[in-house]
């Protein structure tokens, strides 16, 4: 029997890896569009600024084809490079399109008519067509300009610093909308605004060069549709990761925003590793977890085998992303979410409810977390030289704090900023500490939260923890009032979905 079990473990470990092709294998050739990328051999800031504005207008143009938009975006992302011709070669690595480079010498005075290099081979008709596309902006853009400030395009770009300021500001906004272009393209505007505010505070985005929301939405859709563009951006992210601490400003910004893109769509996998395996609590010894533990072991091996590009499976539209779905290990996932719900306040922004969520193991995770919060890691205690009395004192102190504050916070944590004036705290034991009550609260948060609540999305970083709401006035009951009503209604009776919907009926969201 033991030989069969060992064979099963080996089979599970190799099953994830057997479909992997050899490194560098070229996929079968398919029909590919020709994408025209414009190249400047001059570092003149006036020419580069004009080309950036021209390409931005092509991306937003009503009449532009997808190949026009993809080429314009690739040109924009290559403009910070001192040698555009070499930098565009990154796009040649994509099997999705053929890249045609067109060298240009400038623009006709007062227009967007290209002056192509003699070697480019562009006809007069093509030049006129591109100029017409640049002028054909959507009616949804105010003042017929992509920028919030209608006077930006009339600026004199006579210094390289001025050009770089605009270029970095525009490209950073394109990177920001790339973050969730595959996993949550309909993310609320507030989520984007938070990141914009962060980079504005850091001085990486000049407020004068802010794009209109409609312009950012169109750019996001183009990036979502263009695999060749996403391939190019992935190569840029890898370049940014390879930089030393002393890097240029652009790749420092790309590396920073890349942290939002890495492992997108794999939140369930990494949270399961963090809370189910990282805690190393005795509950993992349950026989029901054995098969799924082997599955997680094989997935960790697969992730390492995929190499650097494993971080960007969603951006690359890789089928391997499905292997990491939490539906492949539902019991461990349910158990981990129960632990995370108790331990981590950030989990309030993570929509973990799934059709395969197991109620029993979710409750098991919550109970395990509450009982084990005072447990001591023996190896760490030995490294610190703690005596048995000190270990016991630590465990007892945490147990007292947890018990005393159970009514103040549903996860057993302490909220030092909560106001208790005029508010009666209902003990957790009296509220029916059931999965239904937690799920009801989770569904309520999913409706109410404005960002970071999409499927398979990692909990937001520290700067995005606030649950911002729309600026308009609210007439209905607040979230706290509804939550308190639900909590009070739970005394003596479990919460049902119909009751929750009735409670939410007047909530102004």
From Swiss-Prot:
GO molecular function: RNA binding; structural molecule activity
Keyword Plastid set for record: no
Cellular compartments annotated: Virion; Host cytoplasm
Superkingdom classification of source: Viruses
Region (Ncore): 1-404
Alphabetized Pfam families for the sequence: Paramyxo_ncap
Record keywords: Capsid protein, Helical capsid protein, Host cytoplasm, Ribonucleoprotein, RNA-binding, Viral nucleoprotein, Virion
Residue numbers spanned by region Ntail: 405-509
Chain segments carrying region Disordered: 452-477
GO CC field: helical viral capsid; host cell cytoplasm; ribonucleoprotein complex; viral nucleocapsid
Biased composition (Acidic residues): 458-469
Chain sites annotated for binding RNA: 180, 195, 260, 350, 354
Entry keyword annotation includes Oxidoreductase: no
Similarity comment: Belongs to the paramyxoviruses nucleocapsid family.
Description of how the protein assembles with itself and partners: Homomultimer; forms the nucleocapsid. Binds to the viral genomic RNA. N0 interacts with the phosphoprotein (via N-terminus); this interaction allows P to chaperon N0 to avoid N polymerization before encapsidation. Interacts as N-RNA template with the phosphoprotein (via C-terminus); this interaction positions the polymerase on the template.
Function comment: Forms the helical nucleocapsid (NC), protecting the genome from nucleases. The encapsidated genomic RNA serves as template for transcription and replication; encapsidation by N is coupled to RNA synthesis. Forms the encapsidation complex with the phosphoprotein protein P. Before encapsidation, the newly synthesized free N protein, so-called N0, is chaperoned by P.
Entry domain remark: Ncore is globular and carries the regions required for self-assembly and RNA-binding. Ntail is an intrinsically disordered monomeric domain in the C-terminus.
Name of this chain's protein: Nucleoprotein
């Amino acid at each position: 029997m033991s030989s069969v079990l060992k064979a099963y473990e080996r089979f599970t470990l190799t099953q994830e890896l057997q479909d992997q092709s050899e490194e560098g294998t070229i996929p079968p050739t398919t029909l590919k569009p020709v994408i025209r990328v414009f190249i400047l051999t001059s570092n003149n800031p006036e020419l580069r600024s004009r080309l950036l504005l021209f390409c931005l207008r092509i991306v937003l143009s009503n009449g532009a084809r997808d190949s026009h938009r993809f080429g314009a975006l690739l040109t924009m992302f290559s403009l910070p490079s001192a040698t555009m011709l070499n930098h565009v070669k990154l796009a040649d690595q994509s099997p999705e399109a053929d890249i045609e480079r067109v060298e240009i010498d400038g623009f006709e005075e007062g227009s967007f008519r290209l002056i192509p290099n003699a070697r480019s081979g562009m006809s007069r008709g093509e030049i006129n067509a591109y100029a017409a596309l640049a002028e054909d902006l959507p009616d949804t853009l105010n003042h017929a300009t992509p920028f919030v400030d209608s006077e930006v395009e009339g600026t004199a770009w006579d210094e390289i610093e001025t050009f770089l300021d605009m270029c970095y500001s525009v490209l950073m906004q394109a990177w920001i909308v790339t973050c969730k272009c595959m996993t949550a393209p309909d993310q609320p505007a507030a989520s984007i605004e938070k990141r914009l505010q962060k980079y504005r505070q850091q001085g990486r985005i000049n407020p004068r060069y802010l794009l209109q929301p409609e312009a950012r939405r169109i750019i996001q859709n183009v990036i979502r549709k263009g695999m060749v563009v996403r391939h190019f951006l992935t190569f840029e992210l890898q370049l940014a990761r390879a930089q030393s601490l002393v890097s240029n400003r652009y790749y420092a910004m790309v590396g920073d925003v890349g942290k939002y893109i890495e492992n997108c769509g794999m939140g369930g996998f990494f949270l399961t590793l963090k809370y189910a395996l990282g805690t190393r609590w005795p509950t993992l010894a349950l026989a029901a977890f054995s098969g799924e533990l082997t599955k997680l072991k094989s997935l960790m091996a697969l992730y390492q085998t995929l190499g650097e590009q494993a971080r960007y499976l969603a951006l690359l539209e890789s089928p391997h992303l499905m292997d990491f779905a939490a539906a492949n290990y539902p019991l461990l996932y349910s158990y981990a979410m129960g632990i995370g719900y108790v331990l981590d306040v950030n989990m309030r922004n993570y929509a973990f409810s799934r059709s395969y969520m197991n109620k029993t193991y979710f409750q098991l995770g919550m109970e395990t977390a509450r009982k084990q919060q005072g447990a001591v890691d023996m190896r760490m205690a030995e490294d610190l030289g703690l005596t048995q009395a000190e270990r016991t004192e630590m465990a007892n102190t945490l147990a007292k704090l947890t018990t005393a504050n159970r009514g103040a916070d549903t996860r057993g944590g302490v909220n030092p900023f909560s106001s208790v004036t005029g508010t009666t705290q209902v003990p957790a034991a009296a509220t029916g500490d059931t999965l239904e009550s937690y799920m009801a609260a989770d569904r309520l948060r999913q409706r109410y939260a404005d960002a970071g609540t999409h499927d398979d999305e990692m909990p937001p970083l520290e700067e995005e923890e606030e649950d911002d709401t729309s600026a308009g006035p609210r007439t209905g009951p607040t979230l706290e009032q509804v939550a308190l009503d639900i909590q009070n209604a739970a005394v003596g009776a479990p919460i049902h979905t119909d009751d929750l919907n009735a409670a939410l009926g007047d909530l102004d969201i």
